[in-house]
């Protein structure tokens, strides 16, 4: 959106809105980084030949999972039965699933990955049942803009295909309902302001 563009530009960045989908924008940025002296691509999705930086970013996402695990313990929850996490390329989901799979190695929770229906590349890969990546292309129109990614992170896919119990391709109304429920919860629960992508698993 224009507001996001302006906020990023205030930090001194050159910002463009392109008439292409997320995955094509990633390819364009990688090309420009290659052609720029001392250019470095910093991106959380991985592909063959570009794995180191995405793995560092996933480790950062893993810190959030670690903090959540510590809070669960503080509240007396020894092991959650289910863990829901949203996915675009799957980097965050891979980090969360990887962390909790190791934390509860003897009896892992049931992991549920929620994607935007219009960009459900992980769901399609899981449904195919052959362990191979599936790609979704085109505009991938959805209100869950942060999840409108059609090409999985290759590192994450290796984790997710082996540990996730359920993949969900969620229509937009699921995210809209999630936002409403988080913003106006049942009595006693604190309200949470969330965007569409963050609310998708709820």
Model region roles, listed by residue range:
Residues 1-202:
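PLP-dependent amino-acid enzyme catalytic core
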């Amino acid at each position: 959106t224009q507001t996001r563009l302006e906020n990023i530009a205030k930090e001194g960045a050159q910002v463009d809105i392109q008439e292409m989908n997320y995955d094509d924008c990633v390819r364009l940025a990688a090309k420009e980084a290659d052609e720029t002296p001392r250019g470095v691509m910093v991106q959380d999705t991985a592909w063959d030949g570009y794995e180191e930086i995405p793995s560092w970013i996933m480790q950062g996402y893993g810190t959030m999972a670690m903090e959540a695990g510590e809070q669960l313990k503080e509240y007396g929850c020894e092991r959650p039965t289910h863990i829901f996490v949203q996915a675009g390329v799957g980097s965050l989901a891979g980090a969360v699933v990887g962390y909790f799979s190791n934390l509860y190695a003897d009896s892992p929770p049931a992991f549920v990955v929620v994607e935007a229906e219009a960009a459900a590349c992980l769901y399609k890969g899981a449904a195919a049942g052959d362990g191979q990546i599936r790609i979704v292309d085109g505009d991938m129109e959805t209100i869950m803009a942060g999840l409108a990614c059609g090409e999985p992170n290759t590192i994450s896919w290796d984790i997710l295909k082996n540990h996730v119990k359920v993949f969900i391709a969620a229509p937009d109304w699921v995210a809209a309902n999630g936002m409403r429920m988080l913003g106006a919860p049942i009595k006693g629960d604190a309200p949470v302001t969330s965007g569409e992508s963050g609310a998708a698993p709820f």
